[in-house]
Amino acid sequence: MLSPRQGLLRPVGCGVEELRRRRREREADPAVPVVSPAGDRGKGERRSSGQPSSRLAAPRDTADLHQELCLYTLGNLIVESEAGRRQLLPQGIVPALASCIQSPHLPVLEALGYALSQLLQAKEAPKKIIPSVLASSIPQHMLRLLQPGPKLNPGVAVEFAWCLHYIICSQVNNALLITHGAVSTLGLLLLYLAGSVQSPEDAGLELLVCPVLRCLSNLLTEEAVEAEGGQVQLRDERVVVSVFILLQFLLQKHPSLLPEGLWLLNNLTANSPSICTSLLSLDLIKPLLQLLPVSNVVSVLVLTVLCNVAEKGPAYCWHLWPGPLLSSLLDTLALSDTDVVGQSLELLQLLFLYRPEAAQAFLQQSGLQALKRHEEEAQLQDRVLALQQTALHR
């Protein structure tokens, strides 16, 4: 059984569209502005500059340029016309895209990623489109284009990372992606991003952070991950360090995306004592607690991760207290958000269960008074009463 704390992320945009627009404007020909998609991630019109790109590794001919323009046009038509999408499958759109994805030209690949991402977001995609895509060679080529290293192209990788995200969220056949090595590829890409996002030379890579975090978070909820050894691949301490590097990066640059990193940390810690051990041995509890004031959503996720650690048993709770945890929880009890307070109550219950001395410290620091303010809240009454009894009888 999966831990109830594990959860899928929603297959929606996450606020990175503005980042994508700025990157594309930096790369575009100044004489031909890029038309940024609007609304949800990637949905909307995009135009090619119609000019050879300076990023090409090989000369382009008219056929390549024509192919790129056709793919962008196709992507825009997919957004605009459901009737048009219905005609694409019988006309062989998936085999055509599978052929195009083998192109050596980066602008063609980026245009292909755009068109494919529009196709995968169609409402009928889970039943009528994604099964055909998974049955083709496209997934293997997508993962190849996401391999970290000097050949990784940010524009191409961003498009295909979002494509992978839409496929994973459909839950059509994630076991197949795992068999193709998706967890390993994404794990290595996570390490690569953590070492690259702060570098001005790799500015485009910051756009990869959100889809990579989401893909990994969602794949970790699949039972096939255990069967293929995916959890073992992600138990490396470097994964934990990389997540925290990215959390600090997001806190400084894009705080609205912090929940993406915390969801991954939540799903990593839910069923992995070794990841929880890494959190403690690397002294990362304090940095986690420092995220509590960011927002209520962030607070709930931080507290959930800490619950994952605490529920592993007495040895883990010995590392949680004494320390700053108790005072931080008393601060959260002063809040009015029932989700934050409820998660704080659960964490305190676990802490008192395995560290009775923490209950005594809680009482000495006016913990009962902090609980009283929530006694009349219907959603919290039972948990408040249970915690009061636990604290008084430890």
Regions found by a protein language model. Give the residues of each.
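Extended acidic/polar regulatory tracts at the flanks of large eukaryotic scaffold/adaptor proteins
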Residues: L2-R5, E17, R23-R26, N174, ...
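Intrinsically disordered, low-complexity regulatory regions
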Residues: M1-Q51, D337, L345-A359, L363-R394
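Structured C-terminal portions of repeat-based eukaryotic scaffold domains
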Residues: Q231, T277, I285, L289-R373
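Helix-loop junctions that connect tandem helical modules in alpha-solenoid scaffolds
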Residues: R55-D64, L97-P107, H141-N153, L189-L205, ...
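Alpha-helical solenoid repeat architecture
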Residues: A38, R46-Q51, E68-E82, A96-C100, ...
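Elongated alpha-helical scaffolds that mediate protein-protein interactions in large eukaryotic proteins
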Residues: A38, G44-L69, L77-P95, L106-A111, ...
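Exposed, low-complexity/repetitive linear segments and helix-based recognition motifs
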Residues: C14-G15, R22-R26, L65, P107, ...
